[in-house]
Amino acid sequence: VCSSCHGLSFIAFRNLAESGGPGYSVAQAAAFASEYKVKDGPNDAGDMFERPGRPADYFPSPFPNEQAARAANGGALPPDLSLITKARSYPRGFPMFIVDLCTQFQEQGPNYVSGLLQGYEENPPAGFTLPEGSYYNKYFPGHAIKMPNPLSDGQVTYDDGSPATVAQYAKD
């Protein structure tokens, strides 16, 4: 769902099989990579060419450049999601930062992203003026976000029987 607009420019296919990743085998990561076409070269004739992806390749961007991304998204540039959870950490204040040190809690970024994806509301509260081309999100700073709600229940089916809900998608 997210990959239609957002890139993962700092994530290689091999990362899918590393510890801390989603738990794919090396063979699964290689098979996933091979489904993508990657520009390579030049060959002996000096021409660039496309080849199947390899585990060492990075995920290709959904757009050829920033201008194309902005044109497809109403002037907004979708952020790269490679490091989004590290970039969206937030201070928890006293005494929670002490608790976080003791418990090794480091999930502020993932919690922010999950909240953002679940924070869309069809109608803003009374008195709130939503700029044209924006969507109301109760967790986004300022509450006006250019990204439309990307998730809806039943959109993705899980092989393991996990619930097909916005809450589950946002967590994943």
Model-derived segments and their meaning:
Residues 9-15:
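Iron-sulfur (Fe-S) cluster-binding segments and ferredoxin-like electron-carrier domains
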Residues 15-161, 166-171:
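Extracytoplasmic electron-transfer domains, predominantly the class I c-type cytochrome c fold
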Residues 2-9:
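The canonical Cys-X-X-Cys-His
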